[in-house]
């Protein structure tokens, strides 16, 4: 029995990958899950204020993991998982690789976003030399303090929610969701997901992004 459903946002709750337009049918499916007693949590590379707003206005109750795993909110409690990244380091990364900073960087402390989202070997080396982690979600590059990545944040959320791995479902679209999948019992990759994610998923869905969310929730509720 699934008690908690972890859902990624960009590329998963949206109409497709590469758009920020949320799929209304997917939101309705999340509400159906909540009504049936499955709590829904957002697990995303987005910042805390963006996810907290969505969590409350969409009528979710499972809490959230923001900043690509670095920030957790559950039942009124907030928790920082990763080391803080100094502002000068964020600017230096953008300057070195000629990247644009996300408008959400103003609201972040441990994980920062940049575009274009193309991850290069030199960036990984640059981050490693400074004790940092860099990943790409397909929407943005993420530079984070250690441990970085969705896994550590999801472990903390499950602990706060007092939910076991076997009682947890997860759905996502990108490589950055692999770590989230390792912490969940049933995992579903949308049809347009990165091949690396499909390889580790327990279910490869027939439908893309938001339509895939409806498909997965129908499965969980039937
Ligand atoms: O913030 C991003 O780059 C993408 O966010 P996601 O984890 O919801 O796909
Ligand atoms: Mg995504």
Swiss-Prot record:
Binding-site list for substrate: 150
Binding site residues for Mg(2+): 8, 10, 173, 177
Cofactor(s) for this UniProt protein: Mg(2+)
CDD domains: HAD_Pase (cd07514)
EC number(s) from the headed UniProt entry: 3.1.3.18
Keyword Hydrolase part of the UniProt annotation: yes
Pfam families registered for this protein in UniProt: Hydrolase_3 (PF08282)
Keyword field: Carbohydrate metabolism, Hydrolase, Magnesium, Metal-binding
Keyword Magnesium attached: yes
Superkingdom as given in the UniProt entry: Archaea
Enzyme class, UniProt record, top EC level: hydrolase
Residues the record marks as active site: 8 (nucleophile)
GO molecular function, one term: phosphoglycolate phosphatase activity
Enzymatic reactions: 2-phosphoglycolate + H2O = glycolate + phosphate
One Gene Ontology cellular component annotation held by this UniProt entry: cytosol
InterPro entries cross-referenced by the UniProt entry: HAD-like_sf, HAD-SF_hydro_IIB, HAD_sf, PGPase
Functional description taken from the UniProt entry: Catalyzes the dephosphorylation of 2-phosphoglycolate.
Family membership: Belongs to the archaeal SPP-like hydrolase family.
Protein name per the record: Phosphoglycolate phosphatase
Species in which this protein is naturally found: Metallosphaera sedula (strain ATCC 51363 / DSM 5348 / JCM 9185 / NBRC 15509 / TH2)
């Amino acid at each position: 029995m699934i008690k908690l459903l972890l859902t990624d946002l960009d590329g998963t709750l949206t109409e497709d990958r590469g758009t920020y337009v949320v799929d209304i049918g997917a939101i309705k499916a999340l509400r159906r899950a909540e009504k049936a007693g499955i709590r829904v949590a957002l697990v995303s590379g987005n910042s805390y204020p963006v996810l907290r707003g969505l969590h409350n206005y969409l009528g979710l109750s499972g809490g959230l993991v923001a900043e690509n795993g670095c920030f957790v909110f559950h039942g009124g409690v907030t928790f920082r998982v990763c080391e803080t990244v100094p502002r000068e380091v964020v600017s230096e990364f953008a300057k070195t690789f000629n990247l644009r900073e996300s408008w959400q960087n103003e609201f972040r402390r441990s994980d920062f976003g940049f575009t274009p989202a193309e991850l290069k070997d030199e960036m990984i080396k640059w981050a490693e030399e400074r004790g940092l982690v860099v990943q790409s979600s397909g929407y943005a590059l993420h530079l984070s303090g250690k441990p970085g990545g969705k896994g550590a944040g999801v472990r903390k959320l499950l602990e706060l929610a007092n939910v076991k791995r076997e009682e947890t479902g997860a759905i996502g679209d990108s490589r950055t969701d692999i770590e989230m999948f390792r912490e969940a019992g049933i995992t579903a990759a949308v049809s347009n997901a990165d091949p690396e994610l499909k390889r580790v998923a327990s279910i490869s869905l027939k439908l893309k992004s938001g339509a895939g969310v409806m498909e997965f929730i129908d499965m969980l509720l039937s």
